[in-house]
Regions:
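ATP/Mg2+-dependent ligation/transfer catalytic cores
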Residues: 1-210, 227-241, 252, 388-389, ...
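Short acidic (Asp/Glu) and glycine-rich catalytic loops that position anionic groups and cofactors
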Residues: 7-11, 167-169, 270-281, 366-373, ...
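Intrinsically disordered, low-complexity charged/polar segments
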Residues: 408-438
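Active-site capping/gating regions of soluble enzymes
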Residues: 17-18, 26-33, 38-48, 52-120, ...
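Short hydrophobic/aromatic-rich motifs at helix boundaries and adjacent loops
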Residues: 1, 161-162, 212-217, 362, ...
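Eukaryote-specific, cytoplasm-facing alpha-helical/coiled-coil scaffolding segments in long proteins
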Residues: 324-326, 415-423, 467-476
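Histidine-centered divalent-metal-coordination microenvironment in nucleic-acid enzymes
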Residues: 113, 152-166, 209-223, 257-279
């Protein structure tokens, strides 16, 4: 028995003694039979960014074989706005590598994410998961390397305020109980996410913490480990489903909305990326940021105005992207700098053995920390279409390897100061700005769409649909229009409270 596999929280991994990437149809059937699973759920992302579910009762083995092999029909026009009702039938086919036991189901149930196929049995070009697959595949074909990612999933928990052990307003970062009220809820979420296959790094309370009209609003975060980019999207998708369902069970309201109210921390969805080759992280060379990393960053300096179309998808997103809110407003990057768009966080590049210094009885470990270095995109938020967002970032990083002056772009956009401080206002003025509305984001995507459509990664129909939806908000002057109008701002927040 493999001890590492036996420790895995996903019941299938522990039982089958193999990683999810090796799951077969026979494995799924064996698990269902031996664990007395009575139902199967197909789950798949729709155009609103949320998971949809199709339930099956297992009548007999022949029926189980049929649904696992053939999938089922669904109405694509009810799932995606860019699919017309006249030719809307799609197939959904389960991906065995995503299988998990539903932690909420009273009847033993096995759930799997699905891929979409058209009438000819070919992958649907505009499907979220297939778009990301194409972006990842093309990145590898162009660079010879693998694109990996992980997300920092921020959310607010909202419940009646007891008045006891009040936390300090906007000072909730890494707070412990009893000042942080929802630690138990967060750790239960983490346990369930791990059971569904999520590779979690850690969880903690976040900056946002305030009371309003008798309710406490507490911001929390669950951060994941870097994995292949398609797997990263699947994990985040399921994690949001878990957190919402558990919130419902506890009687808490939960939101991933980018903005709650004026002057309070909004919720982001920061994405960390690393580039791998032969199992080795390529982000560092000789302890400093590598040329490979700087080329990828250059791509993210060229395309961020249009990338906002994927992770900043409703008007409240642009109320978060303002100065002094730990959210970026300008196109730049830097080391350990939270005022920039792309941050290079600490990467354990120091030559000292900190464990030995903290624990004198320990011998030097010579632990390989080179795998840890990432770069972080800080503009995304909880309204994101996860698959489009990660596909867009893969395209941007790939583009950095295709432009001749990538290293010059990286050098010109690097900053090592807080760009929002008055003494640095000249530097701030020299930097390109992110869009300030959905309409502006749509305009930027229209201008740069050819790069996303290259290699047929994003289909023209998908880009058209995104632009049409963003322009439909008609929010070009909304940020200025709502200045000093807290009640109207609150109405807007409520409208998009359950986005993404």
């Amino acid at each position: 028995m493999n001890y590492d596999l036996s420790m895995n929280a996903n019941q299938l991994v522990a039982f089958l003694q193999k990683p999810t990437s090796e799951f077969t149809k026979a494995d799924i059937i064996s698990f269902i039979q031996q664990k007395d699973i009575r139902m199967v759920n197909f789950m798949y992302p729709a155009g609103d960014g949320r998971l949809k579910t199709l339930n099956f009762v297992i009548n007999n083995q022949a029926y189980l074989e049929a649904i696992l092999t053939c999938g089922e029909r669904v109405d694509g026009s009810s799932l995606f706005s860019f699919i017309e009702a006249g030719s809307s039938d799609l197939y959904v086919i389960p991906r065995f590598c995503t299988a998990f036991v539903d932690p909420f189901a009273e009847i033993p149930t096995l759930s799997m994410l699905c891929s979409f196929f058209n009438k000819d049995g070919e992958p649907l070009e505009s499907a979220p998961e297939h778009t990301l697959y194409k972006a990842s595949k093309t990145f590898t074909e162009v660079t010879g390397m693998e694109f990996q990612a992980m997300g920092e999933l921020e959310y607010y928990v909202i419940a009646p305020d007891t008045g006891m052990f009040q936390a300090t307003d906007q000072r909730g970062y890494h707070e412990s109980g009893p000042y942080a009220k929802f630690n138990e809820f967060r750790t239960q979420c983490m346990s369930y996410i791990a059971q569904t296959g999520g590779q979690i790094k850690y969880g903690h309370s976040e900056v946002g913490n305030f009371t309003l009209d008798g309710y406490i609003y507490e911001q929390n975060e669950i951060e994941f480990l870097p994995v292949p980019v398609s797997q990263a999207a699947d994990q985040l998708m399921i994690a949001k489903w878990v957190i919402r369902n558990l919130g419902y069970r506890y009687g808490y309201n939960v939101t991933f909305a980018p903005k709650i109210t004026a002057g309070k921390a909004g919720s982001g969805l920061h994405v960390h990326m690393r580039i791998m080759k032969d199992g080795k992280n390529q982000m560092l060379k000789d302890g400093v940021l590598s040329e490979t990393a700087r080329k990828a960053i250059a791509g993210m300096m060229v395309l961020p105005p249009s990338i906002t179309a994927f992770p900043n998808t409703n008007p409240t997103s642009y109320f978060r992207l303002v100065p002094h809110q730990e959210a970026p407003t300008n196109v730049c990057w830097g080391d350990r700098n939270r005022s920039v768009l792309v941050r290079v966080p600490l990467g354990w590049a120091a030559k000292t053995d900190m464990c030995t210094l903290a624990n004198p009885l320990e011998a030097e470990s010579h632990f390989d920390t080179s795998q840890k270095q990432t770069v972080e995109m800080r503009s995304p938020d909880g309204s994101a279409d996860l698959y489009q967002l990660l596909a867009g970032l893969a395209v941007a990083c790939r583009h950095g390897f295709e432009i001749e002056n990538a290293l010059d772009i990286a050098e010109k956009t690097y900053v090592n100061v807080n760009i929002h401080q008055k003494e640095n206002e000249d530097k701030l003025k020299s930097l390109a700005q992110l869009p300030d509305s959905c309409e502006a984001s749509a305009d930027c995507l229209q201008q740069q769409r050819a790069i996303f459509e290259q290699y047929n990664v994003f289909s023209p129909a998908m880009i058209d649909g995104i632009i049409r939806r963003l322009r439909g908000y008609e929010d070009k002057t909304l940020r200025a229009d709502l200045e000093g109008k807290p009640m109207e701002m609150l109405d807007l927040v409520h409208k998009y409270f359950h986005c993404g």
